[in-house]
Amino acid sequence: MSLKVPKANNLQLFKDGYKHLSGLEDAVLRNIQAVSELSDLVRTSFGPNGRNKLLINHLGKLFVTSDAATIIREVEVVHPAAKLLVMASQAQEVEMGDATNTVIILAGELLKKAEHLLIMGLHPSEITRGYELACKKGLEELEKLSKSSLPTPLTQDSLATALKPAIASKQYGFEDTLSSLVAEAALAVMPPNPKNFNVDNVRVVKIMGGSLAGSRVVRGMVFGREPEGMIKKVNKAKVAVFTCALDIAQTETKGTVLIHNKEEMLNFTAGEEKHLEKVRPVVCSLAPEMLRTMQIFQEIADSGVKVVIAGSTVGELALHFLNRLGIAVLKVLSKFDLRRLCRVVNATPLARVGAPTAEEAGYVDVFESIEIGGDRVTVVRQLVESDEGFDPTDKSAEKTRTATIVLRGATSNLLDDLERAVDDGVNVIKALLKDGRLVPGAGATELELAKRVDVYGSGLKGLSQHAVRRWATALEVVPRTLAENALGGSEGNEVVSRLWAKHEQDGGEVFGVDVEAESDGTLSAVDHKILDSLAAKSWAIRLATEAAVSVLSVDSIIMSKPAGGPKIPQQAGNWDDDD
């Protein structure tokens, strides 16, 4: 019989202030508890009937949203185990733009099931091995569940149909309008090879007032302000983009001059007088600064430039001369929008005020100010084949297609949430263009995978079969959450029971949750065209399993003492950094 040798009380391994947690109770189960709390937080926001969360971040900004990616980004999770789930959901957001909530609630459910196995006495390595086997089998079966794919050639109706489930989970009731807007904008910028679709070419402009029905798609870049000068419309013009201020350069030092005698006073103005004698009599009365400014903008006008884009301030004197020379001026303060605009007009941003060279100047077909819902906006766009006046022989500039979705809404919070739904929809299009396979939605795919993986686990030998079957049971959380959020807890359980009965029948793999409860709470996802991206499902299952395995692999937590001194407050950063 072996005896346990007690540790010496004076054994000092770490510096003072370190925390060391190890063992099943202190490390593993505590991590699972933290992850479960995060999972329960966003679970009620899952699906079309998910509840909104009202968040106020450290800067006092208000968010009202059911978007899981926004929720976990603004709550600032600090627990190390929960951060693993946050990173997994962020990877899903970057890769697919959809199913971020699925990653969190599925990983949380996997760890809840693992907790029961750990308490029963299974070793974490057996559970992780079983989860990895189940994930591999589940992804193999997922490939077999594909019922259709994105049709070619692409049409607005086919794209809108594929987008509706993803947008309905964010803005239920508005999915028809939003999916149509996103599909129209995506088709307007679709390159000849759809796999090269760039999500950055679809922009969003939010204009307060009206309703979502007043939203529209404008081909080109739209800026929520009108031009600075009197010139409001220019066609087929050269464009100059400046990142510096269009103003007279002035030093910060004082311009005080000490004059001792009359000779010094005469010499002080002699240089300016000689300079003025060389210029035309018309401008002899101008001050030297005004003269230099006029000469600079005259050079810009002589180079053929008719549109000037300013990335900083525009001085009154500069604006006066630009108006006299018939040059339109637009101020764009966002460095991201300035970069996109340079790509659209094929221009090089200049850090100095002066006439651009032929290589630095851009070209735009239409620069105009229009009215949308009582607000004046500026549109910069290139003509395409379907536009009147398009010249296929005109090679004056490389044409870059851009479309802007102009959203209307009553409040800024609603507009922000609509913008997040549009961004998700555009990312879903990008994912579907790479892999167009579709699987039944409404929880049908997860329930069918649960059934098939459970059968697979029953045939395994060894302790891993328990983890495989628990993995299959965890997939049931998706249809169960959809039903509970839509119909309530007790009714949700009955719907899941009916779904299990239908999935045991031939052809039952297409049945999912009916969130509108028209009959018994179930429906055929294929008949109702509720289809999800196979690639998004695959990534969500893989990332959720990897996150759960990572948490289960931890047996010890070591935390150092925080650095001394007052904590530095988090800075707000530039207003343009989150674009």
Task: Give residue spans per PLM region.
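Extended amphipathic alpha-helical scaffolds
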Residues: 2-70, 75, 135-406, 410, ...
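A short glycine/serine-rich beta->alpha loop
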Residues: 22-25, 69-75, 89-99, 125, ...
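Extended, low-charge hydrophobic alpha-helical regions
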Residues: 29, 76-78, 401-579
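Short, hydrophobic/aliphatic alpha-helical segments
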Residues: 30-42, 78-95, 279-283, 295-296, ...
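Residue-level signature of catalytic and energy-coupling elements of molecular machines
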Residues: 47, 97, 121, 182, ...
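Early transmembrane hairpin of solute transport permeases
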Residues: 52-96, 112-120, 127-131
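Short hydrophobic alpha-helical segments that form membrane-spanning helices or hydrophobic packing faces
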Residues: 54-57, 103-107, 341, 447-452, ...
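Hydrophobic or amphipathic alpha-helical targeting/insertion segments
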Residues: 110-154
